[in-house]
């Protein structure tokens, strides 16, 4: 008796002929039924594991379940023993055995002209079906991860028919309670396991266009089973509209908002503060010195907003490494905060001493070393306001360029201010004599 996922057990005997391509055919099933929906178009040959292009844009065979897509690089696809078989109505626990097959998807060209490879997607096939139908359970095959229920016999193939995409839709992948999903992966919720298949893509495009016409004509919304790519933006726009904010206008940071952000950061405990443009490093933790010796001029202004900070954050220890990998010491200190008339609180310091070890194999090692060398003890070379020592003031009357020190800095405005003597000309002497002559009365008659 063959089992069909999502349906009750079939009453037909399992004496059907299994073709070489892995599709189960009954004695009364003709080959013409497969071309029923071609509408005069030439039938496309079925892709197999051997004929799959190197780009990986064709999924060989059809899985009964939706795929699991990787979204973080470097994460291994694995399940614990006894886990990893999807739930399917009509499939007993004794037939819950098979493998996950890695489908390497195609690459695409980005806007800047570079090629970007999509992360792989995994599909489940029951034991004895799919691209590795003849492989024994547990065989070491690249891109294959074997899973089985504890009640299943892995020495015999699963008595499950292959999926016919023309009559059976893929089942959304679900697991029993307690199953731990691989980290860095998510389950596809579209309900299709062959997104690049021509038949399913045409059917989905026709269905989506018909659905859009129906929605436009009726004015009602039809719920969809998939998650659209712009759903996050739509939700954000609805939230902003509810709050009375326009999502299209850029948010401007005013002095009032910057002050509120700074005060919000300063209200946190010292070890929970994250300096940024609105609340600088000096405002959060004080001036640089021997005990706080990290940060160049640019990083002190931007804080964690500095473009170089994320790569440094990779070196930061976790909470577990901080407590279990450091030397800790608890000390009671004097409370210098608060007024004298307020009740004094007991203040303690949890002092720590540890080290962060890394080597040249760390990704971005050269950049990390460059940033560390630029910011460690940078306060000793700084001449701006972040330096511990004030900027030396120039002495009064002193100029740059090695000029005479007795020369005034400001140029005199007139010869009177210069207070310098000069020789009298003949005209000046004549005027002086006229001023010295006594006044004589003029008795001439008019």
Curated annotation (Swiss-Prot):
Residues 265-384 are annotated as: Dimerization. SUPFAM superfamilies: Coronavirus RNA-binding domain, Nucleocapsid protein dimerization domain. InterPro entries: N_prot_C_CoV (IPR044344), N_prot_N_CoV (IPR044345), NCAP_bCoV (IPR043505), Nucleocap_CoV (IPR001218), Nucleocapsid_C (IPR037179), Nucleocapsid_N (IPR037195). The modification Phosphoserine is found at residues 166, 190, 389, 421. Residues 1-54, 157-230, 265-290, 381-446 are annotated as: Disordered. One of its GO terms (molecular function) is RNA binding. GO terms for cellular component: host cell endoplasmic reticulum-Golgi intermediate compartment; host cell Golgi apparatus; ribonucleoprotein complex; viral nucleocapsid. Disulfide bonds: none annotated. Residues 52-193 are annotated as: RNA-binding. The keyword Transcription regulation applies. RNA binds at residues 105, 121, 163. Residues 60-189 form the CoV N NTD domain. Residues 265-275 have a biased composition (Basic residues). It is found in: Virion; Host endoplasmic reticulum-Golgi intermediate compartment; Host Golgi apparatus. The modification Phosphothreonine is found at residues 173, 425. ADP-ribosylated. The ADP-ribosylation is retained in the virion during infection. Phosphorylated on serine and threonine residues. Keywords: ADP-ribosylation, Host Golgi apparatus, Phosphoprotein, Ribonucleoprotein, RNA-binding, Transcription, Transcription regulation, Viral nucleoprotein, Virion. Residues 9-22, 195-226 have a biased composition (Low complexity). Packages the positive strand viral genome RNA into a helical ribonucleocapsid (RNP) and plays a fundamental role during virion assembly through its interactions with the viral genome and membrane protein M. Plays an important role in enhancing the efficiency of subgenomic viral RNA transcription as well as viral replication. Belongs to the betacoronavirus nucleocapsid protein family. Homooligomer. Both monomeric and oligomeric forms interact with RNA. Interacts with protein M. Interacts with NSP3; this interaction serves to tether the genome to the newly translated replicase-transcriptase complex at a very early stage of infection. This is Nucleoprotein. It comes from Equine coronavirus (isolate NC99).
């Amino acid at each position: 008796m063959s089992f069909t996922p999502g349906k009750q057990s079939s009453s037909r005997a399992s004496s059907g002929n299994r073709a070489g391509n892995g599709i189960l055919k009954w004695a009364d099933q003709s080959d013409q039924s497969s071309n029923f929906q071609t509408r005069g178009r030439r039938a496309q040959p079925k892709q197999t594991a051997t004929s799959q292009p190197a780009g990986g844009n064709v999924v060989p065979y059809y899985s009964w379940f939706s795929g699991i897509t990787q979204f973080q690089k470097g994460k291994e696809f694995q399940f614990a023993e006894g886990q990893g078989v999807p739930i399917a109505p009509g499939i007993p626990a004794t037939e819950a055995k098979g493998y996950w097959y890695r489908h390497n998807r195609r690459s695409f060209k980005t806007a800047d002209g570079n090629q970007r490879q999509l992360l792989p997607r995994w599909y489940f096939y029951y034991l004895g079906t799919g691209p590795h139908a003849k492989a024994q359970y547990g065989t070491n095959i690249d891109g294959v991860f074997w899973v089985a229920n504890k009640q299943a016999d892995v020495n015999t193939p699963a008595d499950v028919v292959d999926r016919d995409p023309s009559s059976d839709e893929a089942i959304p992948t679900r697991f029993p309670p307690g199953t731990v999903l691989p980290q860095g992966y998510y389950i596809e919720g579209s309900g299709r396991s062959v997104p690049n298949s021509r038949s399913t893509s045409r059917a989905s495009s026709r269905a989506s266009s018909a659905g859009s016409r129906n929605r436009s004509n009726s004015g009602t919304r039809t719920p969809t089973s998939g998650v659209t790519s712009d759903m996050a933006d739509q939700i954000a726009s609805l939230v902003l509209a509810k709050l009375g904010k326009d999502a299209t206008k850029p948010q401007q940071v005013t002095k009032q908002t910057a002050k509120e952000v700074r005060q919000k950061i300063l209200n946190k405990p010292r070890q929970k503060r994250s300096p940024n443009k609105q609340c600088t490093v000096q405002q959060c933790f004080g001036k640089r010195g021997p005990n706080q010796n990290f940060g160049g001029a640019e990083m002190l202004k931007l804080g964690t907003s500095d473009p170089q900070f994320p790569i440094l954050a990779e070196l930061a220890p976790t909470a577990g490494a901080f407590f279990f990998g450091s030397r800790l010491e608890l000390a009671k200190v004097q409370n210098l905060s608060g007024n004298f008339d307020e009740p004094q609180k007991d203040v303690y310091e949890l002092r720590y001493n540890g080290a962060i070890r890394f080597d040249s194999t760390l990704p971005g090692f050269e950049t990390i070393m460059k940033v560390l060398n630029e910011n460690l003890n940078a306060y000793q070379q700084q001449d701006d306001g972040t330096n511990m020592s004030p900027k030396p003031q120039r002495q009064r009357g002193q100029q740059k360029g090695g000029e005479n020190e007795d020369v005034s800095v400001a140029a005199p405005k007139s010869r009177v201010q210069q207070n310098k003597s000069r020789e009298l000309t003949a005209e000046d002497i004549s005027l002086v004599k006229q001023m010295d002559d006594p006044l004589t009365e003029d008795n001439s008659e008019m």
